Design a protein with these regions (language model features):
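Histidine/acidic residue-rich metal-binding segments in metalloenzymes
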Residues: 136-147, 162-267, 284-304, 358
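Divalent metal-coordination and catalytic microenvironments
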Residues: 9, 26, 48, 59, ...
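His/Asp/Glu-enriched, well-ordered alpha-helical/loop segment
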Residues: 227-238, 274, 278, 288-373
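Di-metal (Zn2+ and/or Mg2+/Mn2+) metal-binding site signature of metallo-dependent hydrolases
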Residues: 49-71, 214-215
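Histidine-rich, glycine-flanked metal-binding segment
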Residues: 1-52
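C-terminal cap of metal-dependent C-N hydrolases
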Residues: 347, 362-406
């Protein structure tokens, strides 16, 4: 295949450049000032666009996506949302999960995403995990992963609460990439963390835990996980998502925990959209923000990513599948700089997913996002929908806008 030349794009901090990408290797081959690279049969004019690393979505729930109206959900806190989802999930089919997840992935792709880590529930009926096929959501997403190969990388984490060991083994044998857990919903959080690490180690897969999804400063999932990882010497990759309670403890305690997390090599995913929506409903005065201690984690050297979490389901009726919205919220609610916030949904997200660096730099993976803007602050502030998305150097999505004034 012929290489693709992207002409006249603006790179953050570097000015206007021409970027040559190899569609064979999927890497950026050359970056040069305008006019220095020879013309070829495949060129795109990106004048007026800012060229960025393509975002990755480190935390999605594609099996739940687009069910807010279907489930008849009402606003409420986390446990209210869990109850609403379980009631709906008891009758959901594999085909329905597949179709909704496909629509959600199309939204993510159009917004710039080229890699997604999605959690998928082991589906229960009212009697627990024994009725129907608890793996039907996983089967739907495995089919979707096969269908999307070459356009988007899909990692699947099996999410459970006190599910039988044999069901977890079966899910991983089917092809799930990681093992998830919600220890704060378990009858025995410490035992749940230990079991998750044990089974993941047996299958040589990573883990991604929903940790401390509460404003209770006494919650301790993250510390439990860090200490268990250090004691076990777990090496397959560990992620802790949410970690909300870390944001409401005293700064010295947050710093101590962050150091333990860094020592254990755990990546943390903050999820501002859903946590701002679900958390703090019982505190009508001086309501906490429901975010983890992002600055303390960064200062300790922890890899921090940011995700969108829910896409219009019982856990958040307004999720837009747009990492640039997530980054914008990190500036507003997390007090990160625009550059830090953008990194959380690009480089930080890819690092948590275990993917190599991407972006408009020689030798990097040619997963790229071109946005009609001039600066990073404009990208996050205006959230312009005019975007071109490249996966492995290949154009996979283009959104154009017609705006008329009368």
């Amino acid at each position: 295949m012929s290489p693709l030349l992207l002409r006249g794009a603006r790179l953050p901090g570097e000015g206007v450049r021409d970027v040559l990408v190899s569609t064979d290797s999927g890497l950026v081959a050359r970056v040069a000032p305008p006019g220095l690279l020879p013309s070829g049969p495949d060129e795109l004019d990106l004048n007026g666009y800012l060229l960025l690393p393509a975002p990755a979505e480190p935390h999605a729930h594609l099996d739940k996506a687009l069910t807010w109206d279907l489930a008849g959900a009402l606003p409420g806190d986390l446990l209210f949302a869990v109850t609403a989802w379980r009631a709906y999930a008891a009758r959901v089919t594999e085909e329905e999960v597949f179709q909704r997840a496909r629509r959600a992935v199309d939204e993510l792709c159009a917004n710039g995403v080229t890699a997604v880590r999605t959690h998928v529930d082991l589906l229960r009926d009212d009697g627990g995990y024994g009725g129907g096929d608890p793996l039907r959501g996983l089967r739907a997403l495995l089919r979707l992963r096969r269908q999307l190969r070459g356009r988007i990388r899909l990692q699947i984490a099996v999410l459970h609460v006190d599910a039988p060991d044999e069901l977890l083994h079966e899910a991983l044998d089917l092809g799930a990439d990681l093992l998830g857990d919600c220890p704060h919903l378990s009858a025995n959080p410490a035992a749940s963390v230990e079991r998750t690490l044990r089974i993941a180690a047996e299958h040589q897969v990573g883990v991604d835990l929903h940790a401390d999804e509460t404003l209770d400063p006494g919650a301790g999932d993250l510390r439990l996980l860090a200490r268990a990882v250090l004691e076990r010497g777990f090496v397959s990759g560990v992620t802790a998502s949410h970690c909300v309670s870390l944001g409401v403890v005293e700064p010295a305690e947050a710093a101590r925990t962050a150091k333990e997390v860094a020592a254990a090599g755990i990546g943390v995913v903050t999820l501002p959209l859903t946590n701002l929506y679900l958390q703090g409903r019982d505190r009508p005065s001086s309501t906490p923000r429901g975010l983890t201690a992002v600055r303390a984690l960064l200062d300790a050297g922890v890899t921090v990513a940011a995700g969108g979490d829910n896409i219009r389901d019982p856990f958040n009726p307004v999720g837009r599948a747009d990492p640039l919205e997530t980054a914008s919220l990190l500036v507003t609610a997390g007090h990160l700089t625009p550059d830090e916030a953008l990194y959380a949904v690009t480089g930080g997200a890819r690092a948590v997913l275990g993917l190599p660096a991407a972006g408009p730099h020689e030798g990097a993976v040619a997963d790229l996002l071109a946005v009609r803007a001039q600066t990073v602050s404009e990208v996050l502030g205006a959230s312009c929908p005019e975007r071109l998305v490249f996966a492995g150097g290949r154009l996979v999505s283009r959104t154009s806008v017609v705006r008329e004034f009368f």
